[in-house]
Amino acid sequence: MNASREPRPILSGPVLTRVGGIPVDALDIVADPTRLLLAELAAITERLRRLSEPLTDVLFNLVPRLDDDIALRRKVLSGKRAVFNLKRPPWDQDTLDRVTARLTPAEAGLLEEWMRVQAARAAALAKLEDQLSRERAETVQVLRAALDGPGVLESMAIAAPEWVRHADLGAATPRNVKTLYSYVSRAAVKTSPFSGLTTVGVAGNEGGGRARSRAAAAMAMLALHRLARSPRTAHLLTYRGAPVRPAGGDAPGSLLLHGEMAIAGGVIWRQDSVMEADHAISWLDRLGEDDLSFAQVLERLGGADPFARFIRLLDAGVLTIVLPWRLSEAPLERLAELVDGVPESPISADDLRTAHALGDAAHRERVKGRLAAFDGLGRYARSWADPKRGRPVPDALLYEDRETEAVLPDICAIPSVRDDLLSLGELMRPHLFRSHIYDLMLEEFVAAFGAGGTCDDPLAFFMRLAVERDGNGPLDVAMADDMRARANPGERAWLPVGPTSAPPSAAVLFQLEAEDYAQVAEGRYRLVVNHFSAGSGALFTRFVRLLGADFRSRLVRHIMSTRPGVACRELVLWTDCNTAQAECANLLPPLSLPGEPTRPDAITLDDTRLVHDAGTDTLSLVDRRGEPIGLTYLGLIPQHMVRSYARLLVVLADPWVNASPHSDYTLAKLPELLARCRPGQVVPLPRVQHGRVVTRRASWLAPTSALPLPRSGETPAELVVRMDAFRRAHGMPEEVFVHHLGGGDFFTAGDRKPLWVSLASPTSAQVLEGWLAPGVEYVRITEALPARNAHPQLDAERRRRATEHAAMLIWPEES
């Protein structure tokens, strides 16, 4: 299909709304008296600043006239320095009287006013100190009270079980306050679905408060490998040699597809690598290409101790386990069925069923029940794990999603909102371009099979492109070319793709700022664009089981509408070990990759061919009858984070790079933002707005050394006055979000979510200090937009809730 040059998209599919799990007023940690005192002190400081220069001149001119009183001259010099620094001269009353006596009446009046303003400042500071002392205790109480909302503490028991279990949640200790502040602010103003800290619903519906939970997918993988390594249960499973293909071309030898579970920073994935088969090829020749029973494996391996060989090949990834569960099945329950009646099993069927039940029932439990579920799952995970062989205990053992109970308006049915999104799409479209990785596949395919050619073994083709020797030069170059093209895609935005590939699309994540939805309906609002994601539906599929049949069918219709007349299949990836990926799967008939669970209507790459259309110079995947396959990747893991041969497949499914600058996502702007940072300077960047649509919040790039963080020996009042002065000096609002900008490595900015900060709260400054990652030199400070008091969604108690909406835009193919 040719990419349409019509810039206006269409809205497609359901609209997903994320709802904050805690009302935004839970962050009312700064009282009005504090704001009034800070305003008073700011006015006093401004008055002192105006007085400072003339009074400094007065004292400077006085010094030469004090040769007759050296001691007084020294005191005047120290007083001059104090005035220059807007401080009270360090004089007693006698010194003040003696200095005044040496001045003219006008000069004395200036000094008297300085001392009077300084006294007013000292009085205001004392009041502020008292106010902050009360506010500190009230802050902890306010934050702690937020945990008492419906379902909040239950969600916290999943997010931070050890804190909920052991901490005094209302304690004013720095560590507890930091944890309390971080979670409450996240649930109140950062709409990122996690248990009940952010709930989800379908726009236009009233949420039913449904929930679902499960044990982590990695739990089943730990158990599976434990069973495979035991001679008492290895016979219950089926095995297969790792995929191997000829190196192709002039390259000798064979290539091996090696997969292993990897865990880092709490994220679990299957790390697939294409490498030279080397000495593994002799073993793979023995094993053959078919599925094998345990007895067949031992027979083919032979030797004095075939089981030892079996274990070595299993650990090396040369031999793989065929997953015994299907996509629609609960993995732990399926393993329990396998070991039923095997008394010598290293893991009992009862334990496997109990582990499944603990995860499956957790969403119905209160706090104690959830903590008990964590305890049970933790015991099982520790007994099944094998850290020495790269299978440690996962950080996240329990997964939960929750549906909102709110009535959610169909915001995209409001004509002005709909028109704003479509107009945004017009701005975006020239910045959506075909990836250079697609070009690489085209070039390599035509070189190997000729224009209009056919490849009967697509897996071999993708493996050859992704082989890892000293890096992967061509693939790395293509990714670098994509980065360079983001600034000016030009004609790349209009390059064609085949029927396997999706047309340009995007999911727009946005928020509305208005007093209420009546104002939105009248067109009196701001639409703030937070981020773009894949328009395939990948952001939505995680919630299909939660949100029900109608949501599912609308999502399927959306996917099918992107490729009319083409049978679509889902590219399944990492569902064996990554829980979120597993939750996203099973919407469409799958194209199953090696290492993935399957289902009866699944096909593999062995059931397909890759073909080139010489007329359009595009690639398509077809079945053995020659019918095109519409391929869609629906995983939560963004496709730019997928590596090895699977990266080529996700690019074939969706070849479009979204380089649109029309969202306020810090990580996407990181190279640009870092280039604009200046040592020792706070660099302001203005808000960018197109009518009602805000595509970039006002922000400030600041060295971490410039931030008003706590100082040793400083009182809370002195700290908060510095914070207030910092924000006023740079024109910042009181409430902001702080984002990391790089540091130790390129991805540091993505390691921690933005932190909500009140620049009128010493508690915020203390939390900010602990939040900053080591090695981060710069931060981006953004205005909090929408403001907390301008979220239009109200809960049943008429309290405001932060909401974020996700709507999908597609640009249909050119007719």
Predicted feature locations:
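C-terminal structured domains
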Residues: 531-779, 783-784, 801-813
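Segments forming glycine/polar-rich beta-alpha architectures that bind adenosine-containing cofactors
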Residues: 229-234, 238-244, 438-452, 603-614, ...
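Short polybasic amphipathic segments
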Residues: 254-262, 445, 516, 618-622
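Short acidic, hydrophobic short linear motifs in intrinsically disordered regions
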Residues: 289-301
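Type-3 copper protein
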Residues: 1-214, 279, 286, 306-577, ...
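Acidic, low-complexity/disordered tracts enriched in E/D and polar residues
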Residues: 4-5, 9, 177-288
